């Protein structure tokens, strides 16, 4: 017989919507059967709530979703991990919207990017909205929160090319702008301000995603999640 969750456990799960509580406990929450099942392969399961051990009302109390999906899990966060990729990396400089971060993680998973460098002011990857938006991709993509300018400086000194999307960059669809042999770091910036000046000065290969038609009025910028997908798609296309 499955033991019913206690009131204390339900209250604890609810408290993990706050970052300070997730950090203090070293855990995070995921919702939805598919997302939970994907994450079980990569993270230690601490608590599982299903209709077998929690009522619908109790699941609603624990959920951060408007329409709870019936399965809620608490997982232990990863320990600090080393960067394992020898191919492309993505670096995020102040991406603050949880939905954008979740979309970028899912996009990186699709295009085979296994490590993302994040500035300290990038959104928390264990925020419930981020976890939900990744659709389980967090199991396969590792995020590293670092002093981003310092890390990128070290990588540049090691000879890694640093790509960044800038309005003054080169049209990335022009020949030889993106190499066939791919390694390096693709840097994406903050939703409102783009790439910070300190990081911008480190970029070795500025890229431009051109608007169409050329020289006609258009939107001021692209959503950072969409821009990341466009850049990664072009890199992988050149690598085929």
Please describe what each predicted stretch is.
Residues 164-219:
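Active-site/ligand-binding-proximal alpha/beta "capping" segment
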Residues 1-50, 122-123, 149:
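Boundary-proximal intrinsically disordered activation/regulatory segments immediately upstream
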Residues 54-79:
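Glycine/small-residue-rich loop that forms an oxyanion/phosphate-binding "nest" at active or ligand-binding sites
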Residues 51-62, 87, 204-205:
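Active-site regions of enzymes building and remodeling cell-envelope glycoconjugates
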Residues 28-30, 44-51, 74, 161-167, ...:
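Short, hydrophobic beta-strand segments that form beta-sheet elements in well-ordered domains
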Residues 1-4, 53-57, 141-151, 207:
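Short acidic-hydrophobic, aromatic-tinged amphipathic segments that line or gate anion-handling sites
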């Amino acid at each position: 017989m499955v033991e019913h969750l206690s009131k204390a456990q339900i209250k604890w799960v609810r408290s993990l919507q706050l970052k300070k509580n997730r950090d203090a406990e070293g855990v995070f929450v995921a919702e939805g059967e598919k997302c939970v099942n994907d994450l079980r392969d990569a993270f230690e399961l601490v608590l599982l709530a299903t209709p077998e051990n929690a009522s619908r009302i109790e699941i609603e109390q624990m959920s951060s979703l408007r329409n709870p999906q019936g399965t809620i899990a608490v997982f232990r966060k990863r320990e600090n991990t080393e960067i394992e990729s020898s191919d492309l990396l993505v670096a995020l400089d102040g991406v603050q919207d949880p939905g954008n971060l979740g979309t970028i993680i899912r996009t990186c998973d699709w295009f085979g990017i296994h490590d993302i460098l994040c500035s300290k002011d990038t959104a928390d990857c264990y925020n419930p909205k981020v976890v939900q938006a990744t659709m389980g991709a967090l199991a396969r993509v590792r995020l590293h929160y670092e002093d981003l300018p310092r890390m990128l400086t070290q990588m540049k000194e090691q000879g890694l090319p640093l790509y960044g999307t800038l309005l003054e960059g080169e049209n990335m669809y022009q020949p030889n702008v993106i190499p066939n042999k791919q390694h390096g770091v693709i840097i994406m910036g903050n939703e409102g301000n783009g790439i910070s000046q300190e990081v911008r000065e480190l970029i070795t290969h500025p890229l431009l995603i051109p608007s169409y038609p050329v020289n006609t009025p258009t939107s001021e910028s692209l959503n950072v999640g969409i821009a990341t997908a466009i850049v990664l798609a072009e890199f992988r296309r050149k690598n085929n």
